[in-house]
């Protein structure tokens, strides 16, 4: 005997309990709330800011660990805190570091996006993630989660594009993206008279 199919779900927009067969949510009016493209795990990330920030931090941490594991012999284990647990340049280049050299010599324009998720040391990763966790909730509160992610991504691309135009040979990190979030928060405060 088969188990009965669950016919209730949370509306992807307002998060109230509704029937999966509803043509539209009776609370918020969202059309076809039971459709698979509106109610899946990937899109669910964009409804919970804490879950999204945890996922974004997890991607940064996972790529950092992967960059360390790609070449364990090139690992920086010195006593200098700025270089402790630092991956080598070849690992970072393989994963998508950007700059004049990767873009001009290897034609990796996609690295303008990927470099925001790579970090040069444990301290670099730690400071970027702490700043992200402090600033992103404010930006999410004022602009919304999707706009915060757009500002973060486009800020990273813009920062790395400026680095490329300035001739920086090799660059990584989420600092440009985090600074874009700071700029968005400052703009919001200034435009509201703060």
Question: What spans do the regions from the language model cover?
Answer:
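Short, intrinsically disordered linker segments that flank or connect zinc-binding domains
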Residues: 1-4
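A detector for small-residue-rich transmembrane helices and their helix-helix packing motifs
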Residues: 6-20, 26-194
